UniProtKB/Swiss-Prot annotation:
Composition-biased stretches (Basic and acidic residues): 1-16, 95-105, 570-589, 606-624
UniProt-listed GO biological process terms: autophagy; carbohydrate metabolic process; lipid glycosylation; protein transport; sterol biosynthetic process; sterol metabolic process
Function in brief: Sterol glycosyltransferase responsible for the glycosylation of ergosterol to form ergosterol-glucoside.
Lineage of source species: Eukaryota, Fungi, Dikarya, Ascomycota, Pezizomycotina
Biased composition (Acidic residues): 1349-1367
Ranges of Polar residues composition bias in the record: 106-115, 206-218, 483-493, 590-603, 626-642
Name of the featured protein: Sterol 3-beta-glucosyltransferase
EC number: 2.4.1.-, 2.4.1.173
Binding site for UDP-alpha-D-glucose: 911-912, 914, 1214, 1216, 1229, 1233-1234, 1253-1254
Stored PANTHER family: STEROL 3-BETA-GLUCOSYLTRANSFERASE
Domain GRAM: 246-285, 724-790
């Protein structure tokens, strides 16, 4: 084994080892493996092989361990099922648009500029900049990189994220216009793209320089602030960008009203009216989920889906248990409105609603009108949040710009008035703001009315003047009007820039727009200018013409947001990327700053020029309005009547629509010619590359790394488009950076060819086969492990993704290199995500995003406190605590604890490990005031009663069955012969004794291995729960614990193992159980379908951190946590054991525990010798519990005991909770209780499974990375496992983390609360079973004839045990109840008088 350079490389190389080693491929050696631990000649020998020649798993026998149910387990473990495919995802028949893709400008991406087509100023700018290209370095093989230099961790490892290339000049500035990513299709003409990019960079540099100079001038002009100015005035000046502090006249707590309330503060100063609201951080949990009907794009039929509103995306799924494969999504970041539909009938509220985005309108139908309202409200909240990427909302407008104020009553308990404000002196666009006051509304209205009237004469004279003065004050005021600052905590210059520039909800640093005529063309009634020029102003007349519905998002981008896509910003000029999408090839001769305004039906080309040195480029652009009106010459007079202007605009509206349609048709007619001219051969190469397969890695700027194979230079130049298309495909935020892509097959029902995307936090897949729409979005935090497997098809190479609580995913690659590279990349990202989560970096990063807004909010409160004092502030603070639009929909937990004490019986059979969890549970029930009782084997009675728990005996000691297994081997001919003679009587005794032990019970909790509980609960008419230590409920996530395959087989195999096991086990005992039901319980014969055991409430007593709850588990199945019985606190260790541990610590040696229980092997001496040699070879100290020496295998080959060296100390017994807390690693057989104890102690666990559920828990330990599962036990394998478990820092840290999580759980308390919560549901099932059984309460023979009894037995009532609530179920229950009463009336009176002792009749429930 070659030496490794560091920990990460060692793990990766171990993972990618082509040779299948005896240790799992999911583990990596922590450091250089000593030469003594190399494989020897015994590497393929298993010294735990049982006696006899009967083969089973891997050619060896399996053993009964801990549970009676092991006899049936061999059926599952020997079964061979090959159904390994999942169902294909459903589709609603919609087809997605594929607009044109465009080039993007990113930081670190080189851009070639054709300077011949630019003006001299542009050429000089572009020549000065040059081509700046970030030095990405040589990537080499991906798995060679260490964690420290991984791109996910670089922001945390270094303060400098981007460094300039020393070979070039200044680094190219970042161009990040407000944008929307589009899907992958051809891009526009490269020449025009480069022209626009060069102009955009030039404008950005110029505006940055001007802003800096302006900021310096303003600072110098202001000088020091007046010390007499109040802190509140100073704070408002900084927050809203005023020229000087303005005295605060009055302030009110109010709400900005649109379709919802945004609560904040109104500050009235000498010159402005300001509104400020602090927004809480967006939640990452699902806001709302449930079933809805969705209409297709072209198909008017509604299809039912499961919808989940989480973050900014509304996703819908064909199967609610398969949440990694959405059928589609609605990206609400581009949402415009959410509103209810028109009622179809008078007097009935509508159930339909629609969501309008910039792309299309989605139509939904809820099950009720109330549900539709709730969905609309939730969607409106999300749309509002998505338009506010910052943590605060600010509005300020000069008092001189207010036209009027009028009352607008909305509700009786609040005062609402409307303020109309002129947006701009150039355009006369008018905005309306509604403010609602719950207190002091009349006072605020009168105050503002007087203030506005005082300014009315001044406002009129200003607007009627030929040309207003463009003083710095007026320019500054005009720029600050009605601007929303969505980012807080920045410098004042930055705040001014964000106010004057675009502040749309997609103005993020690296989000690039890709617009096309197909996407710009809207079916709704928005302006046709959107097809080629984005309008940014609005008016009241315009709203009345378009009749657009307002929504909460209107308050962000003013009223014109509903006549234009919200993805466009508020820039005075369109960005280069928008402009490029609006032009075609014959427009390349124009300057990139050319605009098209349709005012009189003609196109007017106007160049943006910088007129003089005193006017900045941005201010020059501000003089020209891009609104839907006439193009005005700056020297002409403006009309003094806004109403006349609005009428003119209304009249020109048809001409605008016609001109826009002509532009749209002209652009589309030349689109194909542009594609063929610029991308003639590129598409052939890309399509061929797609089917050939391969991989690509992307750098910091999401450009293709230079050392990837088959990289097209043009792809490198356009590399940042990959990340944008990736985010557009899966509706991911701009912060999700693309890292690598692969072409592979996803195995579900059939192999589905597509593309794998690996990003910082997500693993995504998208099908590329025409006619398929499968998408997968899998968070990396949900991935437990990644393993290599053989492909399902010859010549292909498999990769298995193991997911928490979900079935495995199978991918096939054409080449092993691509598969290995994908495995390495995923492992690196898993390590990075794990590192960031453990170190708290993710939380810190998220917290930093809101720190600035919180600080600003706190400083504002402090300033208010300073000015007004505590008494004046208290009413305002109290009202500000209410956030009606951000309320938490989750209700508080209700206490379901029953008022009376319950008699609870716990029925279980098996070994000590089966009884111990019930003792812990009953101790918790005793503390709750209940009267528990354990019904199990008589040998455990002293142990149970020692804890103050009542006891009832159950026959059928499993020792007899264990003896049969030991003496005959599992499922040999002699075993079947003896079991057929003795096992039937064993079951009869078990059933009869269990029926007697469960009398006088109000609730029955049973292990499924006891077999009798569900029938006893039906006879007693009492609620029934199940509890077990291993998975027993049908799921696609895990196989049955007794049917774990050698290799991953997929969800279909996992599910069918439960179906097979249930049927095999029931068939074996059905005859005896039905006979017992008739003779002793007085019940009819039943079947597996009639019992419906999968509807029974189930409690699993293992940790959800060890076995996460599968996504397809129903609500009544709960994983509660381990039920530990802590007995170690009262145990005193022997002196020899304490001295052995103390001596090992002094010597600096690791201590391991080895104990396999009472197993039977063919050569116990050889096994003992193997353990001794492995311990010595690994150089550890061992505490040994040698159970296999108690019962030798072949008496003829008996050998003397092997003497133990001083490094090994043998014990007979010790409490696990005490012993495992004093060791460094544990080695055992993998029983449920022992595994839980070692994991709780936080020590690495080595499992050598022998039988049944031990294979399942061994695989879980390995998947979690906290231990090793050995398939064979020999010196080579065992010594290496011991050394790795005691030296692997990765494994030790993971085990400690898992142990801390398990110790923080309270499984008993959780189980008791689950019992309380599901008790009413269990009572409902008990009532339905009693009705369906149609028997009296006494187990007395019926008076019916044999023919009548047989007829009743043939009744198919498998659908009768369903939920109560639907009309059909109610009718069915009524008929069954009537039939039961009729049957009871036919019985003799003496039968009705008899009842089982302790039964209280049908009213017990």
């Amino acid at each position: 084994m070659r030496p490794f350079l560091d920990d990460a490389k060692r793990r990766v190389d171990r993972k990618l080892s082509a040779r299948r080693q005896s240790l799992s491929a999911s583990r990596f050696l922590p450091s250089a493996l000593p030469d003594r631990l190399k494989d020897n000649h015994d590497a393929q020998v298993d010294f735990t092989a049982p006696p006899g020649g009967s083969g089973s798993r891997e050619g060896h026998l399996q053993y009964m361990q801990q549970s009676i149910f092991g006899m049936i387990a061999a059926v599952g473990s020997r079964s061979d099922f090959h159904a390994r495919f999942d169902e294909s995802s459903d589709s609603d028949g919609e087809t997605g648009q594929r607009p044109r893709k465009e080039s993007s400008v990113r930081k670190g991406t080189s851009v070639s500029v054709n300077t011949s087509s630019l003006d001299p100023s542009q050429r000089s700018s572009s020549q000065t900049d040059g081509n700046s290209e970030k030095d990405l370095g040589t990537r080499g093989r991906r798995h060679r990189r260490t964690i420290s230099d991984h791109k996910l961790l670089r922001p945390f490892m270094s303060n400098s994220k981007h460094e300039p290339d020393p070979s070039t000049g200044d680094e190219m500035p970042t161009v990040s216009p407000p944008s929307r990513p589009r899907s992958a299709t051809p891009r526009a003409a490269p020449i025009l793209s480069r022209m626009v990019e060069a102009q955009a960079q030039f404008d950005l540099k110029a505006s940055s320089t001007e802003r800096s100079q302006s900021s310096l001038n303003e600072t110098g002009a202001k000088g020091p602030r007046d010390a007499s100015v109040s802190p509140l005035s100073t704070r408002l000046m900084d927050m809203f960008g005023f020229d000087k502090p303005e005295k605060v006249l009055v302030e009110y707590a109010c709400s900005l009203l649109q379709s919802m309330l945004l609560q904040g503060y109104m500050y009235v100063t000498e010159g402005h009216i300001c509104f400020y609201a602090y927004l809480p951080k967006k939640s990452t949990v699902a806001i709302k989920s449930g079933y809805l009907h969705k209409r297709g794009r072209k198909n008017p039929k509604y299809s039912r889906y499961w919808f989940s509103l989480k973050g900014d995306v509304l996703s819908y799924y064909a199967d609610p248990s398969n949440l990694y494969f959405p059928s589609g999504h609605v990206d609400l970041r581009y949402g415009i409105s959410a509103s209810l539909g028109d009622p179809k009938e008078k007097g009935r509220e509508p159930r339909d609603f629609q969501v309008t985005t910039d792309q299309r309108t989605y139509y939904f139908r809820a099950d009720s009108a109330m549900s539709a309202k709730e969905w609309v409200k939730a969607l409106q909240k999300v749309i509002f949040r998505t338009h506010n990427e910052g943590e605060s909302v600010k509005i300020s407008f000069p008092i001189e710009s207010i036209i009027d104020i009028e009352e607008s009553p909305m509700v009786d308990f609040a005062e609402t008035f409307k303020i109309r404000v002129i947006e701009d002196d150039d355009s006369y666009a008018i905005d309306e703001y509604f403010f609602t006051f719950f207190n002091s509304g009349r006072e605020a209205f009168e105050f503002l009315k007087i203030l506005i009237n005082d300014q009315s004469l001044k406002i009129s004279s200003q607007h009627l003047s030929p040309q207003p003065d463009r003083s710095p004050r007026s320019d500054r005021t005009r720029k600050s009007r009605n601007r929303w600052s969505l980012t807080s905590g920045t410098s004042r210059a930055e705040t001014q820039r964000k106010r004057s520039a675009s502040t749309s909800h997609m103005s993020l640093a690296h989000d690039i727009v890709k617009s096309s005529p197909a996407t710009r063309h809207q079916d709704s009634s928005d302006s046709i200018l959107n097809s080629f020029e984005q309008a940014t102003e609005s008016s009241a007349a315009w709203q009345s013409i378009t009749d657009a519905a307002e929504s909460a998002s209107q308050i962000l981008n003013r009223s014109d947001v509903f006549q234009s896509p919200t993805i466009y910003g508020l820039d005075r000029r369109p960005s280069g990327r928008e402009r490029r999408g609006r032009r075609n090839s014959d427009e390349t001769a124009r300057s990139p700053s050319t605009r098209v305004n349709v005012g009189t039906g003609q196109q007017i080309d106007e160049l943006d020029r910088r007129t003089d040195g005193n006017t900045s480029g941005r201010e020059a652009r501000d003089t020209t309005s891009e609104s839907d009106q006439y193009t005005q010459d700056p020297t002409k007079s403006f009309s003094g009547a806004p109403s006349l202007n609005e009428l003119v605009k209304a009249g020109v509206y048809p001409l605008q629509r016609a001109a826009g349609l002509a532009e749209y048709l002209r652009t589309r007619s030349k689109q194909m010619s542009n594609l063929l001219a610029s991308e003639s051969m590129g598409y052939i190469e890309k399509v061929s590359g797609m089917w050939t397969g391969g991989r690509k890695h992307y750098g910091e700027a999401e450009d293709v790394l230079p050392d990837d194979q088959d990289v097209d230079p043009e792809d490198k130049e356009d590399g940042c488009n990959y990340g944008d298309r990736f985010r557009a495909h899966f509706a991911l935020p701009p912060t999700e950076k693309l890292q690598a892509t692969y072409f592979a097959y996803l195995h579900r029902v059939l192999p589905l060819y597509g593309k794998i995307y690996v990003s910082q936090k997500k693993l995504c897949f998208r099908s590329l086969i025409p006619g398929t729409r499968t998408k997968m979005i899998l968070p990396l935090r949900d991935i437990e492990n990644v393993e290599k497997e053989k492909g399902f098809r010859f010549g292909y190479h498999g990769l298995v993704i193991i997911i928490r609580g979900h079935e495995e995913l199978f991918f096939e690659f054409r080449t092993s290199d691509a598969r290995d590279d994908c495995a390495v990349t995923l492992h690196q990202h898993l390590e990075a995500v794990k590192f960031m989560a453990e170190s708290g970096l993710l939380a810190e990063q998220e917290q930093n995003e809101s720190e600035a807004a919180m600080t600003e909010h706190r400083m504002l409160q402090e300033a208010r406190y300073y000015d007004y004092g505590e008494n004046d502030l208290r009413p305002l603070n109290e009202s500000s605590e209410l956030h009606p639009i951000f309320d938490d929909p989750r209700a508080s937990i209700v206490n379901f604890k029953p008022a009376e004490s319950l008699r609870i019986t716990c029925l279980t059979i098996g070994s000590r490990g089966d009884v111990q969890p019930y003792i812990a549970l009953c101790k918790g029930l005793l503390a709750e005031g209940h009267r528990p009782k354990i019904a199990t084997h008589a040998e455990f009675e002293p142990w149970v009663r020692k804890h103050g728990i009542d006891f009832a005996p159950v026959e059928g000691d499993p020792a007899e069955l264990m003896r049969i297994c030991v003496e005959n081997g599992m499922f040999t001919y002699s075993f079947l012969k003896e079991a057929s003679q003795k096992f039937r009587g064993w079951i009869d005794d078990l059933l009869s004794s269990a029926w007697a032990s469960c009398q006088d019970s109000d609730l029955l909790i049973e292990s499924p291995s006891a077999m009798a509980g569900i029938h006893i609960a039906e006879a007693l008419r009492i609620p029934y729960f199940r509890a077990f230590t291993m998975p027993w409920s049908r799921t696609r996530a895990y196989p049955h614990a007794f049917a774990v395959p050698e290799h991953r087989m997929g969800g279909a195999y996992n599910y069918i193992t439960y179906v097979m096991f249930d049927n095999v086990f029931w068939k074996a005992i059905a005859g005896q159980v039905n006979r017992w039901r008739k003779n002793e319980l007085g019940l009819k014969a039943t079947t597996l379908d009639k019992m419906q055991p999968n509807k029974v409430p189930f409690l699993y007593n293992y940790s959800p951190s060890v076995v996460p709850p599968p996504l397809d588990y129903p609500d009544w199945i709960r994983i509660t946590g381990y039920w530990f019985l802590n007995e170690g606190s009262d145990w005193t260790p022997p002196t020899a054991l304490s001295e052995f541990i103390h001596r090992a610590r002094e010597d600096g040696k690791k201590i391991v525990y080895i104990g396999f229980g009472s197993i039977v092997v063919s050569d116990p001496s050889a096994l003992t010798k193997t353990v001794i040699e492995s311990v010595l070879k690994a150089d550890v100290r061992c505490i040994l519990s040698k159970g296999w020496s108690d019962r030798l295998g072949d008496p003829a080959s008996a050998k003397p005991e092997v003497p133990l060296p001083s490094e090994i100390h043998q014990i007979q017994a010790a409490p696990h909770d005490w012993l495992f807390s004093h060791i460094d690693a544990a080695v055992h057989h993998g029983g449920a209780g022992t595994t839980g104890a070692s994991l709780r102690a936080g020590v690495p666990t080595i499992i050598k499974p022998f039988f049944g559920d031990q294979f399942f828990f061994g695989s879980r330990v390995e998947d979690l990375g906290v231990g090793i599962c050995m398939k064979k036990l020999n010196v080579s394998v065992f010594s290496r496992a011991l050394w790795e478990a005691t030296h692997s820092e990765r494994m030790i840290i993971r085990a400690q983390d898992l142990g801390a999580r398990i110790r923080s759980e309270d499984g008993v308390a959780t189980a008791i609360q689950a019992i309380y919560r599901d008790l009413e549901y269990a009572k409902t099932l008990a009532r339905q079973r009693s009705i369906a059984s149609s028997t009296p309460f006494s187990p007395t023979p019926s008076a019916k004839t044999a023919a009548e009894q047989d007829a009743d037995d043939d009744v198919e009532d498998s659908e009768e045990w369903t939920f109560v609530g639907d009309d059909t179920d109610v009718e069915m229950s009524r008929r069954l109840r009537d039939r039961a009463i009729s049957d009871a009336d036919m019985l003799p009176d003496r039968l009705l008088a008899n009842s089982v002792p302790g039964d209280s009749g049908p009213g017990r429930n």
